[in-house]
Amino acid sequence: MLRARPALWAAALTALTLLRGPPAARAGAGTMGAGPVVRCEPCDARAVAQCAPPPPSPPCAELVREPGCGCCLTCALREGQPCGVYTERCGSGLRCQPPPGDPRPLQALLDGRGLCANASAVGRLRPYLLPSASGNGSESEEDHSMGSTENQAGPSTHRVPVSKFHPIHTKMDVIKKGHAKDSQRYKVDYESQSTDTQNFSSESKRETEYGPCRREMEDTLNHLKFLNMLSPRGIHIPNCDKKGFYKKKQCRPSKGRKRGFCWCVDKYGQPLPGFDVKGKGDVHCYSMESK
């Protein structure tokens, strides 16, 4: 019984590892120059016991560990055979490389259209790669797991370095700059709106009479700031006079072609007797609205 294949995001990180060219030098604990770490579950005795028997030696020239976080053994791919993120690993001294001149090398590895080639023949990837740092002397754990038999069943940690893929690197910089510019613009707009709201509240508090209608209107506007969607059907903004009290005529918003109904209230918002709250058509409130 074979273990499950790795998740798609782990596969994408593995593909970026395949494209990064010569391995970066490691110092100390081996974390310098490394990117995100994908930690796999340990290949204990129970996990190994679930593996099917390894293929016989005559057909397989070399046995390697399964791709990703697999613990079982499988046949290694020979030089020139198709390979990719989800296929078996290449044999010792080989590395899965995208076809020369492919405009989308990362997608080629995800689709299994790569080729097992000599690990030292990195010149084929030179058009796609950034210049690597000098002093590269040892391969990372991911290189061993992708192209050799040294990484067998056991606890494994795939250390995925930062991508050296030039087009992705350039596009990511452009995207990050765009996001930073949008975030700054949103911050300025938000601070401006917050300042306007604070000024409005300060001016209203300085008024001699702070009526109930004005308080309801401010509560409604403050509530709208936290809504993701604005639906005029469920929102009622009261009709207030200059002193913050209710005007005689209050109306609901229209719903498409259907006009909203109106009703009459006193200065405190209480419906006046003798007027249908859901009356249709124009409602003429007695005692003209206060100016």
Curated annotation (Swiss-Prot):
Subunit structure: Interacts with XLKD1. Binds IGF2 more than IGF1. Forms a ternary complex of about 140 to 150 kDa with IGF1 or IGF2 and a 85 kDa glycoprotein (ALS). Interacts with humanin; humanin competes with importin KPNB1 for binding to IGFBP3, blocking IGFBP3 nuclear import and IGFBP3-mediated apoptosis. Interacts with TMEM219. Interacts with RXRA; this interaction modulates the transcriptional activity of RXRA. Interacts with LRP1; this interaction mediates cell growth inhibition independent of IGF1.
Main location: secreted
Keywords: Apoptosis, Disulfide bond, Glycoprotein, Growth factor binding, Nucleus, Phosphoprotein, Secreted, Signal
Presence of keyword Disulfide bond: yes
Cellular compartments per GO CC: extracellular space; insulin-like growth factor ternary complex; nucleus
Domain IGFBP N-terminal as annotated: residue spans: 36-119
Family matches, as SUPFAM superfamilies: Growth factor receptor domain, Thyroglobulin type-1 domain
Comp. bias regions, Polar residues: 146-155, 191-202
Protein name, per record: Insulin-like growth factor-binding protein 3
Annotated stretches, region: Disordered: 132-162, 177-211
Residues carrying covalently attached carbohydrate according to the record: 118, 136, 199
Signal peptide range: 1-27
